[in-house]
UniProtKB/Swiss-Prot annotation:
Matching CDD domains: HAD_Pase (cd07516)
Gene3D superfamilies: 3.30.1240.10, HAD superfamily/HAD-like
Name of the encoding gene: cof
Keyword line: Hydrolase, Magnesium, Metal-binding
Pfam families on file: Hydrolase_3
Record-listed E.C. numbers: 3.6.1.-
Protein name, UniProt field: HMP-PP phosphatase
Function field: Catalyzes the hydrolysis of 4-amino-2-methyl-5-hydroxymethylpyrimidine pyrophosphate (HMP-PP) to 4-amino-2-methyl-5-hydroxymethylpyrimidine phosphate (HMP-P).
InterPro entries xrefs: Cof, HAD-like_sf, HAD-SF_hydro_IIB, HAD_sf, HMP-PP_phosphatase
GO-annotated molecular function: 4-amino-5-hydroxymethyl-2-methylpyrimidine diphosphatase activity; magnesium ion binding; phosphatase activity
Organism: Citrobacter koseri (strain ATCC BAA-895 / CDC 4225-83 / SGSC4696)
Length: 272
């Protein structure tokens, strides 16, 4: 029996309308009744996730910013990792050949250079909002991560540029097909979950995790049971062929799987 369950949010727990379904909430409550510890492992900001937890009255640990921050159920920071200031400065100030928009995150929030209303649709549940600033004036020593949002093919070309400029001094990953993230070296959801499990006195073999994107890869492959969403990025499924694929987030597939796991743990599972 798993003792810790880790959940990605977008494309996993959240439905396509960016809300948590009633079945999902009921199943999470059942896990807590079984004394299974919950953690939400997401690229979203901790300020947003605290609002969501308050809205659903749920106790959970938070892994936010794709592993840059870990917070306890009481809101205490357990772990932090920022971008190397030299890396942040380079990314902020270099002229990149891309049409993608740049988004900068630190403990104070989400910052970008101009309004992009379409991006706010993903935050309708919480009302979390970017702040419009001159991103080049953000102090480099306060940056947790930098994201570029745009066309996937354009982001692939940008990733080549970033790799050439940064080398092995940062982690680059696609948290969605339209979002490329620059993270601190060695920082990902998997490494953060290892820190959290150690804090809780658990081994990763006692954890299960759910995800759909390449920023979930390390987490999914490191736990005792990793589950991939049916709507996952094809690259994730291809790189982790030994992991089970469940249903689509629109059908609250995490709840469907966990209900079976709680009620019939010894029977084979089918997403149908």
């Amino acid at each position: 029996m798993a003792r810790l369950a880790a959940f990605d949010m977008d494309g996993t727990l959240l439905m396509p309308n960016h809300h948590l379904g009633h079945e999902t909430l009921a199943t999470l409550a059942r896990l807590r009744e079984r004394d299974i510890t919950l953690t939400f492992a997401t690229g979203r900001h901790v300020l947003e996730m605290r609002h969501i937890l308050g809205a659903i009255s749920m106790d959970a640990f938070l892994i936010t910013g794709n592993g840059t921050r870990i917070h306890s159920q009481e809101g205490d920071m357990l772990h932090r990792q920022d971008l190397d200031p030299a890396i942040a400065d380079r990314v902020l100030h270099q002229a990149w050949d891309t049409r993608a928009s740049m988004h900068v995150f630190n403990d104070n929030g989400w910052f970008t250079g101009s309004a992009i209303p379409a991006l706010l649709q993903a935050h309708v549940y919480s009302g979390f909002h970017y702040q419009i600033v001159d991103v080049k004036r953000i102090p480099a020593h306060q940056v947790t991560k930098i994201c570029f949002c745009g066309d996937h093919d354009d982001l692939i070309r940008l990733r080549i540029q970033l790799n050439e400029a940064l080398g092995e001094r940062a982690n680059l990953c696609f948290s969605a097909v339209d979002c490329l993230e620059v993270l601190p070296l060695g920082c990902n959801k998997g490494s953060a979950l290892a820190v959290l499990s150690d804090h809780l006195g658990l081994s990763l073999t006692e954890c299960m995790a759910f995800g759909d994107a390449m920023n979930d890869r390390e987490m999914l492959e490191s736990v005792g049971r990793g589950l991939i969403m049916g709507n996952a990025m094809p690259q994730l499924i291809a790189e982790l062929p030994h992991l089970s694929v469940i249903g689509h987030c629109r059908n609250q597939a995490v709840s469907h799987f966990l209900t079976h796991w709680l009620d019939n743990p010894h029977l084979p599972y089918s997403p149908e």
